[in-house]
């Protein structure tokens, strides 16, 4: 499905992961990823090697969590997380991604890298222990969630290395120029639920028009659902991103956009409300929060990764930004 001739491309990275693939095959992967991120800021990724069982398990966990009674979910709401770590349950109507509209209808469960409460950095922004629901055992929920997170960290590390090769081709920088974002990174993950509405208010979305804050996002969409759209400026239109079998949706965030001088584009996107229930899982590589980046094309000054992401998140939370103070 596309608007006109525009469709978000699909890239098969199996050759990049293969020890026997030719250099030409690997270079083809780099070129396809580079082109997609430069033109659209989005692409569908297949040939990733993530088992179907792991994807099915994480959707099972997502459904189990959101089936819990609201009072159970509220026991681990984000206001109960340590300091500014922002972990746990985020109820519906907490965030407003698009100014001037009603709050987003999505609800989510947020985890990050597991940082013990006695760690010196625990309680700092996006850093601390995770919160877990009492009504779900470790075996049926915590364990598969953390296993999936580990798979996503491996996958996003692969994507960053492919992106680095693309930067090398474009600007001549070393191919490992982006690797610093993988050192002790902030890697929040959100299990997401969008409740169905037959007649939604036109001023409200599941998630309003926005760009992601960090470097690279990995989205797993549920089969048979719709709602995600990407803005394509050359044609001033929204391009739907339908669910593709075995695919992850990859997109660039604002930190990557700034770092590459806009070469890898952070694209606006949104999720509109439908009459069908929708689940998805979003993994975000924000990067090392202490890292200061300068545009690789020399176009601007230095910026702090952590300060940028904290500021953007606080803006979407509005009065609820008290959870970050």
Swiss-Prot record:
It is an enzyme of class 1 (oxidoreductase). InterPro entries: DIOX_N, IPNS-like_FE2OG_OXY, IPNS-like_sf, Iron_ascorbate_oxido_reductase, Oxoglu/Fe-dep_dioxygenase_dom. Pathway: Secondary metabolite biosynthesis. Keywords: Dioxygenase, Iron, Metal-binding, Oxidoreductase. One of its GO terms (biological process) is small molecule biosynthetic process. One of its GO terms (molecular function) is dioxygenase activity. This is 2-oxoglutarate-dependent dioxygenase tropC. The lineage of its organism: Eukaryota, Fungi, Dikarya, Ascomycota, Pezizomycotina.
């Amino acid at each position: 499905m596309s608007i006109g001739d525009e469709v978000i491309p699909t890239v098969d990275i199996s050759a990049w992961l293969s020890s026997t693939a030719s250099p030409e095959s690997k270079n083809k992967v780099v070129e396809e990823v580079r082109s997609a991120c430069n033109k659209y800021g989005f692409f569908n990724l297949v040939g990733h090697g993530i088992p179907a069982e792991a994807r099915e398990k994480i959707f099972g966990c997502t459904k189990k969590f959101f089936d819990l009674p609201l009072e159970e979910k509220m026991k681990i709401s984000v206001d109960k997380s340590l300091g500014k770590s922002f972990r746990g349950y985020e109820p519906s109507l907490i965030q407003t991604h698009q100014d001037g509209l009603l709050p987003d209808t999505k609800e989510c469960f947020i985890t990050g890298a597991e940082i013990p409460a006695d760690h010196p950095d625990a309680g700092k922004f996006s850093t601390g222990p995770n919160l877990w629901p009492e009504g779900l055992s470790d075996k049926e929920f915590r364990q598969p969630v953390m296993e999936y997170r580990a798979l996503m960290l491996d996958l996003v590390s692969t994507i960053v290395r492919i992106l680095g090769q693309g930067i090398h081709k474009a600007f001549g920088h070393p191919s490992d120029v982006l690797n610093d974002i993988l050192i002790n990174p902030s890697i929040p993950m959100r299990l997401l639920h969008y409740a169905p509405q037959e007649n939604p208010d036109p001023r409200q979305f599941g998630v309003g028009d926005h760009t992601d804050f960090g470097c690279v996002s990995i989205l797993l969409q549920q089969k048979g659902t719709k709602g995600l759209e990407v803005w394509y400026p050359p044609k001033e239109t929204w391009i739907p991103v339908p669910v593709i079998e075995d695919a992850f949706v990859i997109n660039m965030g604002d930190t990557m956009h700034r770092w590459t001088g806009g070469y890898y584009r952070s694209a606006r996107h949104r999720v509109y409300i439908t009459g069908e229930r929708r689940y998805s899982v979003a993994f975000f590589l924000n990067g090392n929060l202490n890292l200061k980046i300068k545009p690789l094309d020399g176009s601007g000054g230095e910026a702090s990764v952590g300060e940028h992401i904290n500021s953007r998140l606080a803006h979407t939370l509005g009065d609820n930004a008290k959870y970050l103070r």
